[in-house]
Amino acid sequence: AYFGPSAFIDFIHSLQLELTGADVSFAAPLSFDAKIDKGDITISDMFSLYKYENMLYTMNLTGAEIKGFLEESYAMWTNRMKSPDDHVLLLKERKKGQENYVSFVNFSFNFDSAAGIIYTVDVTKPKGEKITILKMADGKPFDENKTYKVALNSYRGNGGGELLTKGAGIPQDELKSRIIHSTDKDLR
């Protein structure tokens, strides 16, 4: 999911869109290095991939808020590349004892992507200009002034990661009024 398509994230998006009837889905990989070995999938495998308890929310967001959300997400994860030698991901060097290593600047569970829309990310552009939403996944036009139903987890829907507050510009005290449905069971 950090470098391109991810079957797991595609699966999460598909489930969220199907279960909610939403127009757009937001989801994060949640873990950078989790893996499932070949063979039967167990409940514990799923918990290693999706370890946090969350409900599934459906919220009302405008097209402009969706774009702002994605701008914030990708600004937290992608460098503004000025040359082919620059890292795509926003990384920082750290030292642990005698060892040097590189890690993400931000938590992996705050890197959301979207489904239900066709969009591009230009990593040579600054925050606010990285995201271009071309159209809805069904080919219909995307309208920044229209209100869309968006599926996302409750951590994000309650303001976690600040993608809705700082990114979309929705005041924290308004988030609850944007929720149009919540599951009564944990997503896992």
Features from the language model and the residues they span:
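Catalytic centers of hydrolytic enzymes
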Residues: 1-188
